[in-house]
Amino acid sequence: MWYFRALHRRRAHWLAALLPPGPARVLDAGCGTGGFIRVLRAAQPAWSVTGLDLSPLACGLARERTRAEIAEGSITALPFAEGTFDAVTTGDVLYHVEDTLAALREFQRCVRPGGVVVVNEPAYRWLWSYHDDAVESKHRFTAPGLGSRFRAAGLKVVFSSYANMLPLPLVVARRKLFPPAQPTSDVQLYPAPIEALFAGMAALEHAWTTRGWSLPAGSSVFVAGVRR
């Protein structure tokens, strides 16, 4: 699925860009069934990747599929000591919790001084739609707003950008002009030509942002920071 491939690539790139070479301890907070853990392990064999998820079912599947250490718990109360990790990352999880600042403070607490926090979340309250109802969203963010939360949590923002800018007109049209009869998630596998189109758009955006250039708009927002 193009969306998850792009999301995994974005997070993996910035973790690798901001962490020093060599071994690292990384937490995937809200790891689901372990898809991103597998991506990181393949890309960075020297890293020790731990997962955490609120769902017992997801934790069980993640353990089975990755053989990694998987903890059951909430991102607002991480069951780890201060400074346990070199990096904490989450992808489209923060928007599910009421107290997003509490979660970011937990991420800050659990990384060492100078440690990295990488977050990707849905963008723009005005883009709220049937999709958000289907996936039980509580928030959508802007880049300035999410960056402000990072700073309030004791994190220094080192890169901030929107993502999925090129598909944004199609997303707006789908969600605002042609909504389905029943609430459903837009994150799904599309026919191969559509998947290829979106994957090509994502590749162009990745080439842009990996140069350190931000995108001014998009259906997702991405922030990377370090613990002060």
Name each model-derived stretch:
Residues 117-139, 145-149:
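Short, glycine-/aromatic-enriched active-site segment of Class I SAM-dependent methyltransferases
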Residues 63, 98, 112:
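Short conserved AdoMet
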Residues 155-165:
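Conserved S-adenosyl-L-methionine
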Residues 167-228:
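A C-terminal cap/extension of S-adenosyl-L-methionine-dependent methyltransferases
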